[in-house]
Amino acid sequence: MAVDFTTDELDEVASLIARSSCNVALTGAGVSTASGIPDFRGPQGVWRRVDPEKFEISYFYNNPDEVWDLFVKYLLPAFNVKPNPAHYALAEMERLGKLCAVITQNVDRLHQAAGSKNVIELHGALEYAVCTNCGSKYALAEALKWRKSGAPRCPKCGGVIKPDVVFFGEPLPQDALREAFMLAEMAEVFMAIGTSLAVYPANQLPLVAKKRGAKLVIINADETYYDFFADYIIRGRAEEVLPKLLDRLRGMLF
């Protein structure tokens, strides 16, 4: 699919980023689809094969063995992927001093794999698991070794271990959420990339930034819920738009 944006739009946004001292990016599923992670709600998404209600936090507590079996069979294989040009472009913007932070709704850790340092993970990280009883945190790979079938158990207290990602109905990690809103308040340019801005409370971040005076840039292949609120809209795929934006930004900095 051809991207639908103009050179002038890219130049304007690149100039805005170059002049600003605090630029912040909020990223969603659309940033990782080019790496091979399907949109969970899309035609090829995981929720076509697995009832998403089985990943409600209440269902997990009542049926941890079943949920772990589903997690290992359907979710884990989807995340055996590598960063794509969108991740690398954002990491390079940070290296150039033109991106304060990435706030992500993704759990794949591809931003870190691409080299991003300051990443706020609103929905947790698939790399870890946590004990639901004592709160001890483990590498997911380690927890999987303890699992013969069903849910692994905490070696410290015997509690049920859960993947350290936010399940439906579960509150977001408060430290991450607090930092995300602080960054939104500080931002001079706030970019929402690869997200439809449908999920609360992450979709409040661009509103907070805009109300504090930031310019709002939306980069997405499809329309979003807050297009009407944006200062700039670049309609295209993140992996195609961001490298071009980075090229123009470099040209303005050097």
UniProtKB/Swiss-Prot annotation:
Superkingdom of origin organism: Archaea
Keyword Metal-binding applies: yes
Active site (record annotation): H123 (proton acceptor)
Entry GO MF terms: histone deacetylase activity, NAD-dependent; NAD+ binding; zinc ion binding
Co-factor binding comment: Binds 1 zinc ion per subunit.
Domain Deacetylase sirtuin-type: 3-252
UniProt subcellular location: Cytoplasm
Entry GO CC: cytoplasm
Main localization, broad class: cytoplasm
Main EC class the enzyme belongs to: transferase
Residues that, per the record, bind Zn(2+): C131, C134, C154, C157
The reaction(s) this protein catalyses: N(6)-acetyl-L-lysyl-[protein] + NAD(+) + H2O = 2''-O-acetyl-ADP-D-ribose + nicotinamide + L-lysyl-[protein]
Binding positions for nicotinamide per the UniProt entry: F40, V107, D108
Residues where NAD(+) binds: A29, T33, F40, R41, Q105, V107, D108, H123, T195, S196, N220
This protein's UniProt keywords: Cytoplasm, Metal-binding, NAD, Transcription, Transcription regulation, Transferase, Zinc
Cofactor(s) of this protein: Zn(2+)
Pfam families linked: SIR2
EC annotation from Swiss-Prot or TrEMBL: 2.3.1.286
Record's function text: NAD-dependent protein deacetylase which modulates the activities of several enzymes which are inactive in their acetylated form. Deacetylates the N-terminal lysine residue of Alba, the major archaeal chromatin protein and that, in turn, increases Alba's DNA binding affinity, thereby repressing transcription.
Family under the similarity heading: Belongs to the sirtuin family. Class U subfamily.
Protein name (database record): NAD-dependent protein deacetylase 1
Naturally occurring in which organism (per UniProt): Pyrobaculum aerophilum (strain ATCC 51768 / DSM 7523 / JCM 9630 / CIP 104966 / NBRC 100827 / IM2)
